């Protein structure tokens, strides 16, 4: 990954999340799955103040935990979130590699931290990502596997698989 974050783009069922999880496994890093949806906000990503024992303290969100602990953060369906929520990730994903938490210390990304965005094209609720965000990723377009290649893969992986199941 050479220090880069990835954006895996393509149609549904092309293995984007499977690839992201396998990359984390190959590198031996923990994974934080971050579901991006239309109403996700900065607090859901970075964290927010909470009351514990009469004291206000910061409760980390999945992005800040991943950043601090050197994990792989999978930003699932990143093109469903609004720009306002995604803007908090700009300094995280660019050369600064920091998260600014208002009222708290800056969180510097662990050297091993990587973020992998996934997105589908052209489905209800999705939209184009702005250029500023896309420029912070290496974009990989995931191809759709042909029926013929899927059958070959299934037969190679499961030699005893009956033809009727491979043909479905």
Model-identified regions with their sequence ranges:
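AAA+ P-loop NTPase catalytic core and its hallmark functional loops
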Residues: 1-168
